[in-house]
Amino acid sequence: MNIHEYQGKEILRKYGVSVPNGKVAFTPDEAVKASEELESSVYVVKAQIHAGGRGKAGGVKIAKTKDEVKGFAEELLGKTLVTHQTGPEGREIKRLLIEEGCDIQKEYYVGLVLDRATSRIVLMASEEGGTEIEEVAEKTPEKIVKVVIDPAIGLQGYQAREVAFKINIPTKLVGQAVKFMTSLYNAFIEKDCSIAEINPLVVTGDGKVMALDAKLNFDSNALYRQKDILEYRDLDEEDPKEIEASKYDLSYISLDGNIGCMVNGAGLAMSTMDIIKHYGGDPANFLDVGGGATAEKVTEAFKIILSDQNVKGIFVNIFGGIMKCDVIAEGVVEATKQVGLTLPLVVRLEGTNVELGKKILSDSGLNITSAESMADGAEKIVSLVK
């Protein structure tokens, strides 16, 4: 689950991470009131959306007066902001963070991520802050410092000090930087984060180490024990199809292609997307119906897939282990009738009751193309949507 920058800073502040004073605003009048309460000579007006690249896209403004704050708020609120992470459709700005300005001397990058190769949390840092860390990794990878953290003992002070020196934090501020990194790590662990990214971390003119921006993502599977984090959820920032899918315990992620996929099992779903790409197609989604799908669940899955206007065909790829192929076949037939499906539909079934499942499909009288293998199914659906 993602949250807004201002929410992330609220969390970090509780852990002792230094952040600028700021207030959220939903209207221009609230923005002005926030600036009055901050009493700063310079204000930063920041669009709050779940995407990076806001500054380059015009979503971050510097105001020197309260009138400018109001003007920027009127300009940004209700505007659709398009960044490299939003896609061409962009995101509507519905809230702003009004912050006091900072006298920035130097920008750095500090982040905590889960490294799947080592199954450990990794602290990453760079003196090249304020830019996309992916760009730094591509152009100057030697400027990224990485520390693998032992989960049994956590981030140690000596590790944080080593990182601070390697990214050239001023010597007199190393102590602050160590406290910053260890506090960030504590927040990461205790709040079940999957990403905690500070870009930039800044050194200010008055000698402070501060998080100028904050991106926190959380493990959705841990939200049952993070009730306070769940309250930060902003459904306006989420894909309506993904929200609908969650109501039926379906794992759905929207993609940019035109071939809808309905599969059971995350591994098979990823393999299905790969093989569609192999045959020259583009998957429109990741959709895992799980191991206990009912006819109702399959019908809802079809409706969600078809709510994507880009979908030109559907590939159903099911391996019946716990789930029986005849149950899936009945669900596919019922769903096809309910939604009045006119798009090409290819179904590949394998496993428990596979012959019965295939018979149900063939006896339905519907325009359903049967596939003998995953490769056969992928090749057929790619051909049908061209």
Swiss-Prot record:
Binding positions for Mg(2+) per the UniProt entry: 199, 213
EC number(s) reported in the record: 6.2.1.5
Residues that, per the record, bind substrate: 264, 321-323
Location of the ATP-grasp domain: 9-244
Example GO BP: succinyl-CoA metabolic process
Residues noted as binding ATP in the record, renumbered to the chain: 46, 53-55, 99, 102, 107
GO terms of molecular function: ATP binding; magnesium ion binding; succinate-CoA ligase (ADP-forming) activity; succinate-CoA ligase (GDP-forming) activity
Pathway where it operates: Carbohydrate metabolism; tricarboxylic acid cycle; succinate from succinyl-CoA (ligase route): step 1/1
Catalytic EC class: ligase
Functional summary from the UniProt entry: Succinyl-CoA synthetase functions in the citric acid cycle (TCA), coupling the hydrolysis of succinyl-CoA to the synthesis of either ATP or GTP and thus represents the only step of substrate-level phosphorylation in the TCA. The beta subunit provides nucleotide specificity of the enzyme and binds the substrate succinate, while the binding sites for coenzyme A and phosphate are found in the alpha subunit.
Annotated family: Belongs to the succinate/malate CoA ligase beta subunit family.
PANTHER family per UniProt: SUCCINATE--COA LIGASE [GDP-FORMING] SUBUNIT BETA, MITOCHONDRIAL, SUCCINYL-COA SYNTHETASE BETA CHAIN
Designated name of the protein: Succinate--CoA ligase [ADP-forming] subunit beta
Gene encoding the protein: sucC
